[in-house]
Design a protein with these regions (language model features):
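Mid-chain, well-packed structural core segment of small domains
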Residues: 75-105
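Arg/Lys-rich, alpha-helical DNA-contact motif
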Residues: 61-62, 71
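Core segments of cupin and vicinal oxygen chelate
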Residues: 6-10, 17-61, 95-98, 102-103, ...
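Short hydrophobic beta-strand elements that form part
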Residues: 16-17, 88
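Short amphipathic alpha-helical segments
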Residues: 11-15, 82-84
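Short, recurring structural edge motifs at helix starts
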Residues: 4, 74-75
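The feature marks the first
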Residues: 2-3, 13
Length: 116
């Protein structure tokens, strides 16, 4: 990398964890580890059924998405790999995306969108 990075990573916004059974994930992350359950989200297009949980307070809140596939045989396979993705707070997202693509970084086929 020859040029300076033109953006700053401000923090972690989310961590997405996949498995074949989100109830088992929830039993560990909510019941044992104490994360707060927020709400559920389901999308046939994204092949995902997830529980959205949180840890931390205020500016230090991190979303933890516990995801299972609606159909394990279809793509995307949200359970493979188990650590599916992380979300970062970035000070200049359009600049970051353009620069990272120039560095050869690939993004999800669905693109970058708010809350994902």
């Amino acid at each position: 990398m020859s040029e300076a990075r033109p953006f700053n990573v401000l923090g972690v916004q989310q961590v997405a964890i996949g498995g074949l059974d989100k109830n088992k994930l929830r039993a560990f992350w909510v019941d044992i580890m104490g994360l707060r359950y927020g709400h559920s989200y389901k999308s046939e297009k994204e092949n995902v059924d997830e529980d959205i949980c949180e840890t931390g307070v205020g500016a230090f809140t991190v979303e933890v998405d516990l995801m299972q596939p609606i159909d394990p045989d279809k793509r995307p396979k949200v359970h493979e790999p188990a650590l599916n993705h992380i979300g970062l707070w970035i000070d200049d997202l359009p600049t970051a995306v353009a620069w990272l693509e120039g560095q050869g970084v690939r993004f999800t086929p669905g693109g970058i969108r708010k809350g994902a």
